[in-house]
A protein has these predicted regions:
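C-terminal cap of thioredoxin/glutaredoxin-like
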Residues: 15-28, 55, 108-207
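Local sequence-structure signature of Cys/Sec-based thiol-disulfide redox active-site neighborhoods
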Residues: 1-23
Length: 207
């Protein structure tokens, strides 16, 4: 039986892009059902980050670029300022997942932002990314206008924050346990193998 692994991401988080190789290796070597879950790091009215301020260049120099070189995934600090909100991109993720294209769509969004320096808060950019993986422009436009999808996204955000307890991304949830940050493939596979065999209710009773 497949083990469900939920991965919580935000499309403006570079570490969520850099963990793709780890996820690919996990899928190759373990029987897992990967579910991408949204978690916006900065909800309205919290301002999003600006690349011209001190924080982003510093964290990229100290952490992002070294990790990029380590995992072999090219990546650049986007110049979009302020950084886009990701609500609309996540609304279209719902559509992509309905077509079993969630991972492909997410990769396209990451690529647009971190390699092509595009504004992934812009409808046209989201549509282009979605169409590139097989969705139609019409259905993506409908998804962007859908109040039902907007409500679902709010529910997804609440699930991540209130039910699971997510505070940072990427985070992985396996059998009610969280692995936070960017684990190595070895560590994540070990966690899946151990946690998938446990009974969460029994573990909680033993805590």
């Amino acid at each position: 039986m497949s083990t469900t692994v939920e991965v919580f991401i935000d499309y403006v988080c570079p570490f969520c892009f850099l963990v793709e190789g780890t996820i690919d290796e996990l899928k190759r070597e373990c029987d897992v059902n990967l579910v991408i879950r949204p978690f916006e790091l900065r909800l309205k009215p919290i301002p999003t980050l600006r690349p011209e301020d001190d924080y982003l260049p510093r964290i990229w120099k100290d952490s992002v670029y070294p990790m990029s070189h380590q995992v072999g995934i090219p990546i650049s600090l986007p110049s979009v300022s302020p950084q886009p909100r990701t609500q609309k991109a996540f609304m279209v993720l719902q559509l992509a997942q309905e077509h079993d294209l969630g991972e492909e769509y997410s990769h396209a969004i990451f690529k647009a932002f971190f390699r092509e320096d595009q504004n992934i808060g812009d409808d046209a950019v989201i549509i282009d990314a979605a169409v590139s993986v097989g969705l139609t422009a019409h259905e993506v436009q409908q998804a962007l206008l859908s109040e039902a999808r907007r409500i679902q996204h709010a529910a997804d955000q609440s699930y991540a924050a209130q039910v699971v307890g997510i505070t940072s991304v990427p985070s992985f949830r396996v059998n009610d346990y969280l692995v936070v940050g960017v684990p190595s493939a070895t560590r994540l596979k070990k966690a899946v193998n151990i946690l998938s065999s446990r009974n969460p209710a029994q573990e909680k009773r033993n805590d």
